[in-house]
C-alpha cells in the first residue's frame, strides 16, 4: 500500500475523534471550487451515511487522491454535516467512536494483498470473569465499563508501517477542526436529549458541560459546539507521538477519571496495549472471492452463511422470494449459532481450527442438509449448547475504493452513546464501554440462554464483535464489491444481504441496499422483517413457523461496486435521509 495513502488513513481515524467542524485548515474543501473536469465514473467511489460528505470524498479523488484519502475527507466533513439515528455508527465520533475506543479495518492494497488490523479494546489486567455478576449496570456505565482503548496504537501502527508524512502533519487538520467548532444540528440535539432523559449528565457534570452545556443548559440547534480540550489532546499526540496517550500525564488523567468512577485501569494497562495484524478469511461464492475478517470480529460468521447458501444453485433466481428468504434465514440461524463459540484467539488454542471448520465444505454441506424447506426448527438444532448471542450495539462504517483497485472497509466504535459516560476532564477523551460486549457467567439473558464461555472476561482479552468488513473480487482478481455496516448485532445480516442482493438477485448497489432486510440472531427466537417485505413472503415465513415481527432494520449499510468496464457504483444507506454514495 502506498505510504501516502496510509498516512491519510491515519488522519481520518483521528478526525473521527475530533467531533468538530472543518475550519480554514482546508478551506478549499467546502468551497465547491474543485474543477468541473469530466469524470467517467472510473476514478473511484465513496459510500457513507451523508451524501455531502461523500461528495467531499469524491473531490479528493478528483484531485488525484485515492480510497484512503476519500476516507479521510469523508470523516472530516461528517463532523459538522450530519448525525444519524441510533443504530447508525459513531454519530460524530463522540457517540460511538474516538480515541477512547477501538475498531477493525480491512484493507485491500492495489496489488491485491489484504491486511486485517485489529485495534479493539482489551480488558484491563484487574478485570476478572465475575466482575459484573452482581453489578449489571457496571458493564455499561462507570469506570469498570471501559476497556483499554486501542485506536491511538492502531494509528501508530499504520503510520510506522505505511506512513511517510510527519506525524504532526497527519494530525493537524483534526486539531484545527476540534478547536474551531460547528453548529449543533437537529440530530445532535435529539441525541443529546435522548441520552439525558434519565439524568442530564451532559449539563450537570462539569466535565461534560464544558462542551455540551457551557452556559448551564444543553446547547440547542444552531448553537456552536467546540471541543478545545480535545484539540489540545490531539496536539500533544501530534507533537510527542502515541506514547503521549499511553504514558505520562494524559494516561494518568485517564486512569484518574476511570478510578474516580470505580474503575481499575492502570498506567501499565495503557502502556502495554498493542494492536494485532490478524489473518483474513476467504471463501468462493458464485465464482468470486469473498474476503472478510476473523475473530474477535464476525467476518467468519458472514462467510459461513454465504458458504452454506452457495450450495443453493437457484437461490433467489428460480424462486424470487419466499423459499429463498426462508433458506437465507435458516442459514443465518446456523451462522449465529456458530458465533457463540467465537472469542479472542489469544485465549483459545483451537479457535483457528474452529474458524476454518466454520467455512469448510463439510460444515456447509452438513448444515444445509439439516435445513428443512417446510419449517424452521428449535434453537438447539442451530446452537446445541444453548448459548446467548449478545446484542452488541454501536459502530460506524465507511466503504471507499479507487481506480488502482485499492479499497478500505472500516468500522470503529466506543460502543453505546457517549461510551461509559466517563469523560476525562483534562483531555476531553470520552471513554468506551466495550466491557459490555463480554459475556457474564451466571447471568442468563432475558430469554433464559446461558452466557458463552468463549466470551468470558479475562485480563487482556478482547470482546467479541459483530463487525464484518467485506471485500469481494472477481476470478481475475479485480475489485468487485466493498461493503460493511453499522448496527450492532445486525451488522452481519445487513452486510450479508448487501452481498446476496448484488450477487444473487443481480441488483445494482442502490437497489441492493434499499431492498427490505431480515434479521434473525437466533436468540431471541424472532425473525425481524421490514414492512417492505411483500405479504406473500411474510405469510410464507409464518407458515414455516418463524416468529415474524415487523420492524425497521437496525443496520445501516454502505457499499461500492466496480463494474467490469471499471465504472463504479456506490450507495449510502437509503433508510437515512442524507446518506449517499458518490462516484467520479
From Swiss-Prot:
Catalytic residues (positions): 395
Record pathway: Sulfur metabolism; glutathione metabolism
Residues annotated to bind L-glutamate: 120, 413, 434, 465-466
The keyword Iron-sulfur is annotated on this UniProt entry: no
Keywords: Acyltransferase, Glutathione biosynthesis, Glycoprotein, Hydrolase, Protease, Secreted, Signal, Transferase
Signal peptide: 1-25
PTM note: Cleaved by autocatalysis into a large and a small subunit and the autocatalytic cleavage is essential to the functional activation of the enzyme.
Keyword Glycoprotein: yes
Catalytic reaction equation(s): an N-terminal (5-L-glutamyl)-[peptide] + an alpha-amino acid = 5-L-glutamyl amino acid + an N-terminal L-alpha-aminoacyl-[peptide]; glutathione + H2O = L-cysteinylglycine + L-glutamate; an S-substituted glutathione + H2O = an S-substituted L-cysteinylglycine + L-glutamate; leukotriene C4 + H2O = leukotriene D4 + L-glutamate
Chief subcellular location: secreted
GO cellular component, as recorded: extracellular region; plasma membrane
Record: glycosylation sites: 111, 135, 262, 272, 350, 370, 547
EC number: 3.4.19.13, 2.3.2.2, 3.4.19.14
GO molecular function, one term: leukotriene C4 gamma-glutamyl transferase activity
Listed GO biological process terms: glutathione biosynthetic process; glutathione catabolic process; proteolysis
Localization terms from the record: Secreted
Disulfide bonds: none
Family: Belongs to the gamma-glutamyltransferase family.
Self-association state and partner proteins as the record states: Heterodimer composed of the light and heavy chains. The active site is located in the light chain.
NCBIfam families in alphabetical order: g_glut_trans
Protein's job: Cleaves the gamma-glutamyl bond of extracellular glutathione (gamma-Glu-Cys-Gly), glutathione conjugates, and other gamma-glutamyl compounds. The metabolism of glutathione releases free glutamate and the dipeptide cysteinyl-glycine, which is hydrolyzed to cysteine and glycine by dipeptidases. In the presence of high concentrations of dipeptides and some amino acids, can also catalyze a transpeptidation reaction, transferring the gamma-glutamyl moiety to an acceptor amino acid to form a new gamma-glutamyl compound.
Name of the protein in question: Glutathione hydrolase proenzyme
Record organism: Arthroderma benhamiae (strain ATCC MYA-4681 / CBS 112371) (Trichophyton mentagrophytes)
Upper taxonomic lineage: Eukaryota, Fungi, Dikarya, Ascomycota, Pezizomycotina
